[in-house]
Amino acid sequence: MSDVEIKVENIVASATLGKSLELPKIAPALENVEYNLEQFPGLVFKLKDPKTAALIFGSGKLVCTGAKCIEDSIKAIHMTVDKIRELDTEIPEEFEIKIQNIVASANLGKVLNLEAVALDLENTEYEPEQFPGLVYRLSDPKVVLLLFGSGKVVCTGAKTADQALLGVQKTKERLIELYLIEE
């Protein structure tokens, strides 16, 4: 595989507590929380360490965003649930945490002619009047890459950092195969 490094920019993880939550009671008891039902149907609970935001919904679902590694994402969800459990002792000890999306960035180190890439590379969308990047969809791993003329890449849709890395590596190799960039 080609040598390219990725940087994880954001991880989105979710958890289902299996119990509905009384947000009007929880909101005033938490620090660093935003709760405005007219603007958003849940609480936004911000943690400083790890620096994340947890979206807490009345259905008992949580979404954590902002972590840079899976461990921090899991830690943030557990910290959030522990805070909620202080207010509601019926919150189950066991719950499933699912990684929903990993966003990573990379730099191919080469300028890309996106017009040529759009013509030669399969499964792409490129409309420069609407968005400056080219959208490239891979099926294995199932990720979407945004390619920019500068050679910078954003990979989204991965469930693991390895999937994001593999997506970027496969993309670079395909661009080399098609003579769209040099090795």
UniProtKB/Swiss-Prot annotation:
Any one GO MF annotation of this record: DNA binding
- sequence repeat coordinates: 8-84, 99-175
Report the Pfam families cross-referenced here.
TBP (PF00352)
User: Per its UniProt record, what PROSITE patterns does this chain match?
Assistant: TFIID (PS00351)
| GO biological process, alphabetically ordered | DNA-templated transcription initiation
Q: Does the keyword Transcription apply?
A: yes
- Signal sequence region: none
Under InterPro entries, the record lists: TBP, TBP_archaea, TBP_CS, TBP_dom_sf
Organism domain of life: Archaea
Would I find Cytoplasm among this entry's keywords? no
Q: Which UniProt keywords apply?
A: DNA-binding, Repeat, Transcription, Transcription regulation
Which family is this sequence assigned to?
Answer: Belongs to the TBP family.
Q: Report the function annotation for this chain.
A: General factor that plays a role in the activation of archaeal genes transcribed by RNA polymerase. Binds specifically to the TATA box promoter element which lies close to the position of transcription initiation.
What name does UniProt use for this protein?
A: TATA-box-binding protein
Q: Which organism is it from?
A: Methanosphaera stadtmanae (strain ATCC 43021 / DSM 3091 / JCM 11832 / MCB-3)
Source organism lineage?
A: Archaea, Methanobacteriati, Methanobacteriota, Methanomada group, Methanobacteria
The gene it comes from is tbp
